[in-house]
Amino acid sequence: MFEIHPIKKVSVVIPVYNEQESLPELINRTTAACESLGKEYEILLIDDGSSDASAQMLVEASQAPDSHIVSILLNRNYGQHSAIMAGFSYVTGDLIITLDADLQNPPEEIPRLVAKADEGYDVVGTVRQNRQDSWFRKTASKMINRLIQRTTGKAMGDYGCMLRAYRRHIVDAMLHCHERSTFIPILANIFARQAVEIPVHHAEREFGESKYSFMRLINLMYDLVTCLTTTPLRMLSLLGSIIATSGFSLAILLVVLRLAFGSQWSGEGVFMLFAVLFTFIGAQFIGMGLLGEYIGRIYNDVRARPRYFVQKVIRPASSIDIEENH
């Protein structure tokens, strides 16, 4: 029987990228939600290479009187999950909550996640109710969730929602993973003994635009497929066997038809032969593309370049210049 450790301190990790319009409300609402917990807390805001005034606003927030905000400034944009991992490196709490900066997931839900984690869960996920996103975003999210469920066997309903709570030992385990492509909700579930999901409210985006374009969603799907499983490689082997068998069978059939109906029939089947040829070539290109994705990821991991580069950390009581590679 595992001992359930009480939650004494809560750390909230929020990646920020060009969110200057939403930052004042985000900070106020998140601080109010944490104050209502009756526990120690800290709010870690990670600037992921913003080109607007977000970084300066974070510095000012950390230096404000009675601030609980730790600002972490990355030297450029590394992506949402790398920014969160940077925040994980500086947390001091027993429970770590991740939250997006766009306020679509209300910070007021934080006490509910803490209460659920207090029941002994390692990971508390969330499911967005009445999603206020476009049809394309919702459809893409459903496809990604189904893909993840099938490849991982974990019956979590909404992997795309970043409003989640993790026990400290889960975060420590994730920090020991050094692969370049990281999808935090999936990685956390690999180490979690007990995980649960709760429904949460989902609001419309009031400020700015979504940072996930069509191409970024496509890249995310490629990342998920290639970092989760080697099943596509096995499927390629199976597909190759099927195509080879079909091609051999078709060749035998064409020989028989040629002998039975003469050369005239053979000439009339030229277009079918081209169609079959293009089908095989297309299958080869698909296979080469998937193999290239895996080889590219192996290459990136072998180079062992830093996942992110922390330029500066500003704590409530002092400003500390740090240059770190992770």
Swiss-Prot record:
Ranges in a coiled coil: none
Periplasmic topological domain: 257-269
Compartment(s): Cell inner membrane
Topological region Cytoplasmic: 1-235, 291-326
Membrane topology: Multi-pass membrane protein
Keyword Disulfide bond: no
Primary localization: membrane
A GO CC term attached to the entry: plasma membrane
GO BP term, example: lipid A biosynthetic process
Transmembrane segments: 236-256, 270-290
GO molecular function, one term: undecaprenyl-phosphate 4-deoxy-4-formamido-L-arabinose transferase activity
InterPro entries the record matches: ArnC_tfrase (IPR022857), Glyco_trans_2-like (IPR001173), Glycosyltransferase_2 (IPR050256), Nucleotide-diphossugar_trans (IPR029044)
Gene3D superfamilies membership: Spore Coat Polysaccharide Biosynthesis Protein SpsA, Chain A
EC numbers on record: 2.4.2.53
Keywords, sorted A to Z: Antibiotic resistance, Cell inner membrane, Cell membrane, Glycosyltransferase, Lipid A biosynthesis, Lipid biosynthesis, Lipid metabolism, Lipopolysaccharide biosynthesis, Membrane, Transferase, Transmembrane, Transmembrane helix
Database matches in HAMAP family: ArnC_transfer (MF_01164)
Functional description taken from the UniProt entry: Catalyzes the transfer of 4-deoxy-4-formamido-L-arabinose from UDP to undecaprenyl phosphate. The modified arabinose is attached to lipid A and is required for resistance to polymyxin and cationic antimicrobial peptides.
Family stated for the protein in its record: Belongs to the glycosyltransferase 2 family.
Protein name as it appears in the record: Undecaprenyl-phosphate 4-deoxy-4-formamido-L-arabinose transferase
Underlying gene: arnC
